[in-house]
């Protein structure tokens, strides 16, 4: 793991030397699921990113609007599994899709769908540890598992 600090003008050079020169800058992000993880994610994103959160629960959408009123996020009440909604909301112009619902299967399938629709970077939250290796084998992108992250942090502090 390596970290680089540079000015904006040298980013293409850094990408070239690490073999990531075709890496896509992420400007448009779509998040499926409006839970606490989504809120923390949006609050830590750079201000130049445009974020859309798709949430099925209307009351949760209202709460998200209140929690994220200072952030550059559009809250959409709908089902992130609805292909026509994804197209209508611009998934084809989205560089990153993040599935953060409480359902691992939904997150995995949503990321597979996003990949097939041309999204280059996908992230799926997979709470069921039994699904992690299967999800990794599907090449859906990044897998987040809170339990394994907590275990790694715990081992690092022992």
Feature-to-residue mapping (PLM):
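Cytosolic regulatory regions of ion transport systems
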Residues: 1-158
């Amino acid at each position: 793991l390596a970290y680089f600090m540079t000015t904006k003008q040298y980013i293409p050079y850094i990408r070239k030397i690490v073999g990531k020169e075709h890496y896509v800058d992420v400007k448009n992000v779509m998040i499926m699921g409006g839970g606490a993880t989504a809120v923390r994610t949006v609050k830590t994103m750079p201000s130049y990113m445009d974020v859309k959160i798709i949430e099925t629960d209307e009351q949760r959408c209202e709460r998200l609007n209140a929690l994220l009123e200072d952030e550059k996020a559009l809250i959409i009440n709908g089902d992130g599994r609805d292909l026509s909604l994804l197209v209508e909301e611009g998934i084809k112009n989205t560089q990153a899709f993040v599935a953060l619902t409480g359902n691992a299967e939904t997150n995995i399938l949503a990321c597979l769908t996003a990949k097939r629709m041309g999204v280059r970077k996908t992230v799926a939250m997979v709470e069921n540890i039994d699904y992690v290796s299967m999800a990794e084998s599907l090449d859906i992108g990044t897998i987040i598992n809170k339990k394994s992250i907590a275990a790694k942090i715990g081992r690092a502090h022992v």
